[in-house]
Amino acid sequence: MPPHFIDGEPHDHQHDRPRRVRVAGEPVRIGIGGPVGSGKTALVAALCRQLREELSLAVLTNDIYTTEDADFLRRHAVLPDERIAAVQTGGCPHTAIRDDITANLDAIDDLIAANPPLDLILVESGGDNLTATFSSGLIDVQIFVVDVAGGDKVPRKGGPGVTFSDLLVINKTDLAPMVGADLGVMRRDAERVREGRPTALISLTEDPSSGPALEWVREQVRTLADVHQ
């Protein structure tokens, strides 16, 4: 796998998590998880706005009892309505992305059938704690989003999402002075617990493109699907 470039630094970490067996021509699937309020849906919206002119993409959201996140994306017209789908998990949000992924797989099949050909599907989990991870049978790579508002201790606390995601996004860096968070400490702690896996610090307020997270997604599509722009 080519090295990741996050904040200008190369990363060539070979991940230990088993990979989904991909079929030629299938869209790349990227999971986006993280706690409630960390900015997952805002990141999905930013990625859609930046990528919709260069890739054929769709979004699948997960909510417990509503379709709120999908409705938000439709209201903001980040993609045509038929490219946005929702799964109502009806219970713990991590169950639908890790333990019983049937509803998500069915929804992905429907998106692929309705929007051929797709290059990329973003799968957003429902809000959960630091333990949520995606099944490797559902997605190819996963992003985990935390935010600065929780304080600079969040990366240090670890958890499967923080430690083992393919990309850790530390969001809302513009709030650091207001909550007394040290971004240098957060970066250092993330690098320590993640053992070389890349971390991106972003502020969608200051850079609506999502900066390094966007470039990482582009790299994954190029690497996994051989989509050349």
From Swiss-Prot:
Q: What is this protein called?
A: Urease accessory protein UreG
The gene that this protein is the product of is: ureG
Which GO CC terms are listed, alphabetically? cytoplasm
Keyword set, alphabetical order: Chaperone, Cytoplasm, GTP-binding, Nickel insertion, Nucleotide-binding
Tell me if GTP-binding is a UniProt keyword of this record: yes
Organism encoding this protein: Rhodococcus jostii (strain RHA1)
Q: Which PANTHER family match?
A: UREASE ACCESSORY PROTEIN G
The free-text function statement in the UniProt record for this protein reads:
Facilitates the functional incorporation of the urease nickel metallocenter. This process requires GTP hydrolysis, probably effectuated by UreG.
Q: How does it assemble?
A: Homodimer. UreD, UreF and UreG form a complex that acts as a GTP-hydrolysis-dependent molecular chaperone, activating the urease apoprotein by helping to assemble the nickel containing metallocenter of UreC. The UreE protein probably delivers the nickel.
